[in-house]
Design a protein with these regions (language model features):
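Residues in well-ordered beta-strands of folded domains
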Residues: 26, 61, 79
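A short beta-strand signature within small-molecule sensing/ligand-binding domains used
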Residues: 56-64
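Conserved catalytic motifs of the protein kinase core domain
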Residues: 21, 58, 71
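Amphipathic alpha-helical effector-binding/dimerization core
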Residues: 1-31
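Flexible loop/coil segments at beta-strand boundaries within sensory signal-transduction domains
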Residues: 66-72
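Juxtadomain coupling helices with adjacent low-complexity linkers
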Residues: 32-40, 45-48, 54-56, 72-104
Length: 104
């Protein structure tokens, strides 16, 4: 049995400013006045992280997928339970986001 079960009903949404995937998407865009500090930080390091912003007890790490024209098209994310070190996960999502972006 799984330690946790996560599912979304079709049509369920949350604000783009919540959670690592949304933060990564915003970080892939030019800076905006009044943006969350997490977006500014994600833009500087190339990835975003969040803990419990969308689902309590879950952490996410995400990176923007930027195409060859420099346009952010998507985000790659890994969501997991717990609060383990994210550096290895961050390296993974950044590498895969770059690989996807180079194919666009």
């Amino acid at each position: 049995a799984a330690a946790a079960h996560v599912s979304y009903r079709p049509g369920l949404r949350h604000a783009i400013s919540k959670g690592a995937p949304g933060i990564a998407l915003l970080a892939g865009e030019p800076p905006q006045p009044g943006e969350r500090p997490e977006v500014t930080f994600a833009r500087s390091v190339g990835w975003a992280t969040s803990i419990g912003e969308v689902i309590q007890g879950f952490r996410a790490v995400a990176a923007p997928v930027v195409d060859s024209a420099g346009v952010c098209r998507a985000a790659v994310a890994v969501v997991f339970a717990g609060s383990s070190d994210v550096s290895g996960v961050a390296d993974f999502v950044v590498a895969h986001a770059k690989a996807l972006g180079s194919d666009l």
